[in-house]
């Protein structure tokens, strides 16, 4: 009988099937926002906070020892609260509408034998400031994908490498990835998917875990802006988040997660074209301040 490796290591954090969370930052500065594309004058703004609702669902479609296939959907809506947006069109749009990312994704874990496996992941997201569904078009969409080939050397160690197409840094990049989940002993372990995220894990028990690490997240968001060069700009938003996380089981398959850390501005480039990278395609760049953030979520996890 042919045997196949599983997708987990011992004492790993549980996989979330349903996730609902709230996140909030402290206040920070948003400098260098232009009055319009025709006027060189800049203005600095104070952002009192950014509050966000986050939700995710991952449903196992096929789950056998030969293959695990999941379909999912995600939502990330950020609301910027500016102290005094005034008549600046960019600041008003940012203050009055939610910066939204909503999409669908699929993940396949395919064990090849007892030692080797493949992980394939793809997602498409609609990102922008949408007042209605008609605001969503092809230039609001981003496509991300990851392919990993790996080795499971024991029930405590999985390692793999591959390549990713991602907008996590706000701008489209293709980057090699390192996947490594390892449990050192009953207390300590690590869960890495570099360069996207990485955490050192401490298990008080199998239902009570503390993690320290980071995550890089973001996307490219479209915004209609009448006074810009083309009437629409694209905000390339990337955030680097060093953080501490606490996961604990409440009852059955219901867990809570609390995290706190620093929201470091990796990128906040406002471009005149979709997937733009050149300086002459840039409307402006703002070197956002770096506030602390707090996140709380409830999660329904897999057995």
Describe the predicted segments one by one.
Residues 34, 88, 195-294:
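Outer-membrane beta-barrel translocator/channel fold
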Residues 38-44, 88-94, 130-135, 164-166, ...:
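Extracellular loop and loop/strand-boundary signature of outer-membrane beta-barrel proteins
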Residues 22-28, 73-81, 124-130, 163-169, ...:
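Transmembrane beta-strands of outer-membrane beta-barrel pores
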Residues 178-182, 246, 287-303:
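Outer-membrane beta-barrel "beta-signal"
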Residues 47-53, 96-102, 137-143, 172-176, ...:
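Residues that define the transmembrane beta-barrel architecture of outer-membrane proteins
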Residues 12-18, 65-71, 114-120, 155-159, ...:
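Outer-envelope beta-barrel architecture signal
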Residues 57-61, 108-110, 151, 182, ...:
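Residue-level signature of outer-membrane beta-barrel architecture
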Residues 1-117, 121-134, 142-144, 295:
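Transmembrane beta-barrel domains of bacterial outer-membrane proteins
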């Amino acid at each position: 009988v042919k045997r196949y490796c599983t997708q987990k290591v011992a004492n790993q954090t549980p996989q979330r099937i349903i996730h609902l969370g709230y996140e909030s930052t402290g206040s920070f500065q948003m400098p260098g926002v232009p009055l319009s594309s025709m006027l060189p004058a800049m203005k600095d703004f104070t952002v009192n906070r950014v509050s966000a609702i986050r939700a995710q669902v991952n449903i196992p479609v096929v789950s056998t020892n030969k293959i695990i296939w999941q379909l999912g959907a995600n939502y990330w809506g950020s609301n910027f609260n500016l102290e005094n947006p005034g008549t600046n069109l960019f600041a008003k749009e940012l203050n009055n509408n939610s910066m939204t990312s909503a999409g669908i994704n699929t993940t396949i874990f395919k064990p090849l034998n007892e030692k080797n496996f493949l992980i394939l992941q793809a997602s498409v997201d609609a990102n922008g400031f949408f007042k209605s569904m008609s605001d969503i078009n092809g230039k609001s969409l981003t496509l991300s994908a990851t392919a990993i080939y790996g080795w499971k050397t024991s029930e405590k160690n999985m390692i793999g490498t591959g390549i990713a197409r991602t907008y996590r840094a706000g701008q489209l990049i293709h980057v090699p990835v390192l996947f490594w989940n390892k449990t050192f002993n009953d207390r300590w372990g690590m869960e890495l998917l570099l360069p996207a995220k990485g955490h050192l894990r401490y298990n008080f028990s199998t239902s009570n875990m503390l993690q320290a690490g980071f995550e890089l997240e973001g996307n490219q968001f479209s915004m209609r802006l009448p006074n810009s060069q083309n009437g629409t700009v694209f905000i390339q938003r990337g955030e680097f988040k060093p953080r501490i996380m606490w996961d604990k089981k409440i009852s059955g398959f219901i867990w809570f997660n609390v995290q706190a850390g620093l929201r470091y501005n990796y990128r906040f480039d406002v471009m005149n074209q979709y997937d733009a990278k050149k300086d002459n395609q840039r409307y402006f760049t703002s070197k956002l301040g770096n506030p602390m953030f707090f996140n709380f979520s409830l999660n329904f996890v897999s057995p």
